[in-house]
Design a protein with these regions (language model features):
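N-terminal leader/signal peptides at the extreme start of proteins
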Residues: 1-10
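Membrane-water interface of alpha-helical transmembrane segments
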Residues: 9, 13-16, 142
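Alpha-helical membrane and juxtamembrane elements of multi-pass inner-membrane transport
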Residues: 9-12, 25, 66, 169
Length: 181
């Protein structure tokens, strides 16, 4: 049979657990958010590299923006990827929640629309003039460099961490390869 002292100790342990459990849960979900951020950062780096490989490969049919977008989509494991302005400009705008934007440009592109850019598209694309807020298309040829950039908007699930980061973290990864054609 329990004594009065045993019951008091059990009650004290229950109160201590009630005080500590919110902190433990916050730490647990914070670790989950950090794990998600590391996973997505690695994923977008890999997707940018694979997209750049597709953009520069020599084959019977030269690659297009659609080929690069398809490859990046397949590497992003169900995360939606779109290309609102495939040839840029690469701006500081934020993609929709938990989705990514793809850009295929010259290395170190400017943040403004380019009317006459250096080669900034896969060789299978057709030349096109600047259109609204999108840069002109100038297909690469003759061993030029292309940069594939993926910008991803990660929305965090831990409320306290999300408030500290304005509810999201925008990650960006880029790969620069030289064309083979």
């Amino acid at each position: 049979m329990g004594t009065r002292r045993d019951k008091a100790q059990r009650s004290q342990a229950l109160i201590e657990f009630a005080l500590v459990s919110p902190v433990l849960l916050l730490l647990l979900f914070g670790v989950v958010d950090i794990g998600r951020a590391i996973f997505y950062y690695d994923t977008i780096n890999h997707a940018a590299r694979e997209g750049a490989r597709v953009a520069v490969r020599a084959s019977n049919q030269l690659p297009t923006n659609s080929d690069v977008l398809g490859t990046v989509n397949s590497q992003m494991l169900g995360t939606p990827v779109t290309a609102p302005c495939p040839q840029g400009p690469v701006t500081g705008a934020t993609p929709p929640d938990n989705s990514a934007w793809l850009y295929i440009t010259e290395p170190n592109p400017p943040g403004t629309v380019e009317a006459t850019p250096p080669p900034n598209a896969p060789g299978g694309e057709y030349s096109a003039n600047a259109n609204g807020s999108c840069s002109a298309v100038n297909p690469a040829d003759g061993n030029k460099q292309l940069q594939v950039t993926v910008r991803f908007n990660l929305v965090l699930i831990t409320p306290v961490v999300a408030q500290a980061t304005a509810n999201h973290i925008v990650m960006s990864a880029a790969a620069v390869f030289r064309t083979e054609y």
